[in-house]
């Protein structure tokens, strides 16, 4: 019992001690608040008296006492214990504060000690303080307060005024060392290192500035000497426009670039037999065994190499007609003057420095002066078209990689670009099997693409704009570069007229699919093939089709059992809109899966449509097909649907396109290569003669024969009789007449559709009734 009382007593004593500490903390906070500036807010005696008390001891530094009391009070409230006032950092604070107070007092009383006979520092400080309290003096006269006065008195007696200043310096240094725990040597070394680093940077910048200045002077001197020589060399490459009193723009005809190597290419293409023999030997060198040495159980969706197969030669294509735009050059001078006059009349300071004459359009490079907004030139679109009397112009602002704005004006006549002249530029490149030719850009350079790098392509444009010719050019380019065992194709043509010419070529996996319902099943089979290929990659530890084929090649070298390589698969859909109308969900799901995952499996999509609306080219399809080609469309909305930007509505048609491959920020204007139907037939006939088509059974979309089951509903016969009499079919009518629910009525309508009694669902239109209305005799007998 006594122990319990002692324990309770100790506990109470600890509680009382904590309460005392908290009360002391609150008291210190009270003194800090009312001792520093509270007199300005309150007219009471205590705030003013406390403030004067702090000023008496600390002078102009009286707020330090308030801060010290405030921090100490909060410390007591939070920690509930007394702080260590003799800590090393606290000692440093005391020494530093003493030095500051003494220094302030020296500055105040130094002049008075020299001019007056009274040398009592404490007496003078007392007098100055009460002068401030009575209103005849200022707070600055109090200096460091009575603490500063006492310290200065002792120091002045020991060391005089000069010695006191030295004491102050040492007090500040010693206090800083105690407070920061940094030695003077460390501070000096760090300061020296920082000054040295800054000086080195300054010296380096100055040296670099001097070097650049000398280089600029030297370059300016060289430019002055070589400008004449450069102008002479450029005059040999371009045609000059003789316009007086202004700078002459350079004119670059696309024929200068397109046809500069015609003689060399013609010589190389005169001996197709030799090229075919070399190609054949190269292909034979890559394979060690023929098809007879293969395993009995061949892997599905693989093809054995036919060593007798010869690729089509460029001679099967029509010879290019080297057209030029010489008739356009006589009008360029007048066009340049009209453009500059238009700019001047609207207050736009700009110069035309270069002119590129392309197959279909002429591009004028306009260099605006500093301070001219690009939008000001773009807003002159209609005025420029009016001044040039052009049916439409296109403004490219700015030209990528140049500080210029491009104005594209249609030519009076379009120079035809043939597929052969574009393929001649790339015929030496045999490694890429999926390289295809598109046409020529404004500068005359051949524009080609590699489908395996895109990896999918979306082609859209209005009817008659050149979309089908572009698709035929892509297919022909692949047929002329790849053998059937290297590239396979799946063609879907709901229009039944565009791709049927390719039926029978050995590259096809299945006959050209023309039924939209079969097309959705064909796409599902391609998805299944993609998944099967990924299973093969997983089993062999490879990541893509190139790695898998390399793995098979190494296995074939080490083993007698020869395994075939996986071919690339190109899926062509000529009209996506028809497929989306019949089976939009299945088609979109299959295309989305292929676009997301099929690249590594060697499966690539080429999707063409003549209706570029958002319900056909959905956001999901666009997001997964980054490479796009836009032909002429009717509105800027359709252009934005294809390219995410305008411009396609200003194209001229007849193969004029905007090509935006993956990774490109802006589309490139290209004049598409023309390919006639006769040329396509010659290429197809050559491929069929070399090897007959062997379709893959597992890739042919099968027919679905749905067995119509009997309807287990007593109202079916009555519903059929009602619909035949009314010659109108709807779910709501059956609900009202027979007083049944929606589900049962909809099931009856579906059963009638399966049996050919009513037509299919046509949106807001009523279903058509396919059975005739019964006669009065039939109604009476029933």
Swiss-Prot record:
Domain called FtsK: residue spans: 444-640
Compartment annotation? Cell membrane
Q: What biological processes does GO assign it?
A: cell division; chromosome segregation
Q: Where is the composition biased (Polar residues)?
A: 264-280
Task: Return the annotated region ranges for Disordered.
Answer: 264-300, 760-782
Q: Which residues lie on this side of the membrane: Cytoplasmic?
A: 187-782
Which one Pfam family would you cite for this protein? FtsK_SpoIIIE
Endoplasmic reticulum is among the record's keywords? no
Coiled-coil segments: none
Which molecular-function annotations from GO does this UniProt entry contain? ATP binding; ATP hydrolysis activity; DNA binding
Family membership, please give it: Belongs to the FtsK/SpoIIIE/SftA family.
Query: What does the subunit section of this Swiss-Prot or TrEMBL entry state?
Result: Homohexamer. Forms a ring that surrounds DNA.
- Could you tell me what this protein is called? DNA translocase FtsK
Whose protein is this, by species? Oceanobacillus iheyensis (strain DSM 14371 / CIP 107618 / JCM 11309 / KCTC 3954 / HTE831)
